[in-house]
């Protein structure tokens, strides 16, 4: 399954970027760091490397997206973030681990439903695909609205031809 000439919206956290489980204290200290604005691009890249140091790029999904992109698809990341700074750090992380793969990173407010955003800006939902790890929150509503939607696990199983 490779798509052609579509807009693919893909989630960042636990979809493209695979996180390890953080202990509660580490999560709190990480969130505290987000309140410090970083204006220098190199400093932001270094911060992104540190913050996402134990994260892995989902290379199977990345290869799939690259094939789609080579077939005329546009690939956009949708991320729910309270802080614009963290969305910028995600852009930097993608530039490091997936240069040229992503056409745009779109920050939605925390808790905003991605399907509602997609439905509000896309005229032809037949040319849209959503890939997200949250089945109940994102995939089911997308399918109800007629938007083609998949979990990263489904894409990876299909890419490996295992179903």
Positions of predicted regions on the chain:
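Short hydrophobic segments within beta-strands
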Residues: 11, 78-80, 131
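A general structural motif
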Residues: 3-5, 72, 125-128
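Acidic, Mg2+-coordinating phosphoryl-transfer loop and its flanking beta/alpha structural elements
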Residues: 125-163
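Active-site neighborhood of HAD-like aspartate-dependent phosphohydrolases
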Residues: 1-52, 158
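Short, acidic loop-to-helix structural element flanking the phosphoryl-transfer center
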Residues: 27-38, 42-76, 85-88
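Short amphipathic alpha-helix with an adjacent loop that forms part of the alpha/beta core around
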Residues: 1, 116-123, 160-163
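Short catalytic/ligand-binding loop motif for oxyanion handling, primarily in non-cytosolic enzymes
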Residues: 16-20, 25-26, 75, 84-88, ...
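Substrate-recognition "cap/lid" segment bordering the active-site pocket of phosphatases
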Residues: 80-128
């Amino acid at each position: 399954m490779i798509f052609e000439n579509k807009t693919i919206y893909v989630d960042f956290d636990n979809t493209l970027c695979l996180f390890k489980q953080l202990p509660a204290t580490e999560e709190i200290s990480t969130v505290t760091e987000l309140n410090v604005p970083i204006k220098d691009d190199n400093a932001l890249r270094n911060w992104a490397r540190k913050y996402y140091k134990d994260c892995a790029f989902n290379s199977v999904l990345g290869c799939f997206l690259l094939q789609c992109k080579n077939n005329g698809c546009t690939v956009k990341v949708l991320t729910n973030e309270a802080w614009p700074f963290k969305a910028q750090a995600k852009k930097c992380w993608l530039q490091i681990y997936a240069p040229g793969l992503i056409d745009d990173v779109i920050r939605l407010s925390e808790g905003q439903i991605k399907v509602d955003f997609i439905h509000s800006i896309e005229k032809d939902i037949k040319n849209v695909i959503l890939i997200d790890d949250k089945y109940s929150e994102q995939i089911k509503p997308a399918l109800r609205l007629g938007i083609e939607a998949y979990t990263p696990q489904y894409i990876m199983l299909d890419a490996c031809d295992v179903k």
